[in-house]
Amino acid sequence: MSPTRIVITGMGAVTGFGFEWQSMWQRMLAGEHCIRPWQPEGVEAGAFPVRYAAPVDMRLMPAHLKDHPAWGLSLEKRTRFGWVAATQAIADSGLSPEQLRGAAVLSASGAPAHRLQDMLLSLADNPAQAPSWAQLMARQAQVDPDSSLCQSNDRLARVIADGIGSEGPVINISSACAGASQAIGNAFQMIRRGEVELAIAGGADSVLSLDTMTALYLLGAASSEQRWGSELCRPFDRHRSGLIAGEGGGFVVLETLERALARGATPYAEVLGFGSSLDAYKITAPDPQGRGAVLAMQMALTDAGLEPQQVDLINAHGTSTPLNDAAETLAIKTLFAEREHYRRLLVTANKSQFGHLIAAAGAPEFMLTALACRDDRVTPTLNLHDADEQCDLDYCAHQAVKRKVDVALSNSFGFGGLNTSLALGKYREAPR
């Protein structure tokens, strides 16, 4: 019996580039980025140490994308990002409402924040007129009963499933910056096991708030360096100093190849394998030897029935933090072992262009990897002017690269040592 082949037939993304993956793809190939000056609300200009981010401009969101019965105040920002990305992916796939009825929905979203603040803001048109906690208690009859659940971690998956009328499995993934990739990987495994034929998988997140960005800064993860301006995110560069936070979401439609072809869909790429591991090293830092990352990549390749030398591209986690980039480079070199193998590899870091989307990061990066397989074009790593001596691979610095990409890996590594790697391949009629 031939193994079930699983393909990507729909994609949707919300990033600082906007609300369409097609525009994001073209702008990233052109070497653009969406990082700009940012400061949290309620803080005096220049007082907050983190001054750059890659926010989504909600004012530019087309009105038709807000078509959800709960779009109002009970949907906070990250859930809105996820809903828009998921519905865009479904529209892109050409699936009808009837075809979605048994779909699985797997999503990842970040840790809840601002729950009380959002309740207060929901009672005022102007944030300056939001009531105090005492006034909230006195006006509790006016509070939307759903608001107490509006930021629960399973909220996003439920909103998507409810909105599309799916009665299939609904699963929330909570694994930090590896979340969206794990959602996609688990969806891939569910389809391969025969539990479902169709899944919508991805994630959404927003950490652009005073409390969350303060936490990232105190953790030593977020860069407060000012001298590079909007070129601050510089993965693998000697002067990298920390991540630049972004926000948004991404979702893909995965289905069996048999089902996709039967309904006339054209796959973007094929999902070949999935690997997941834990560093078991330190909650605030990756294993400097990259052992967990090596294991995740090796598991993905073994799952796909591939050897390391068959890989053409690695879409790196590439956070622009001193620890991650060195450890990930070492992990790649360890996996490929032979110098001639890793020297011909292409490696790219999408976060240099749209920042770190935290729990959602793996989803748009997975899409960009699929597009690289489809189009044989790889987005650049920006701002890599002075490579760290520990980071000595081909990172596609400064400009997009045109080269055949038959097999690729997309890596996502989360706080606490959570690692995922997804293996993708160029779609072709005959199986590998």
Q: How does the language model describe each region?
A:
Residues 1-71, 93, 258-268, 367-382, ...:
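ACP-dependent fatty acid/polyketide chain-elongation machinery
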Residues 82-95, 153-157, 161-164, 170-205, ...:
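Active-site-proximal alpha-helical scaffold in enzymes
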Residues 111-171, 213, 217-221, 324-339:
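Active-site-proximal gating segment of KS-fold condensing enzymes and close homologs
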Residues 37, 127-144, 185, 189, ...:
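Glycine-/small-residue-rich "gating" segment that lines the acyl/pantetheine channel
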Residues 8, 40-95, 107, 114-116, ...:
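A glycine- and small-residue-enriched flexible loop/hinge segment at structural boundaries
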Residues 13-16, 23, 66-84, 111, ...:
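Active-site pocket-shaping loop/turn-to-helix segments
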Residues 195-241, 275-288, 318-325, 342-394:
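Acyl-CoA/ACP chain-elongation machinery
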Residues 5-9, 32-37, 227-304, 312-313, ...:
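Condensing-enzyme catalytic core mediating Claisen C-C bond formation in acyl metabolism
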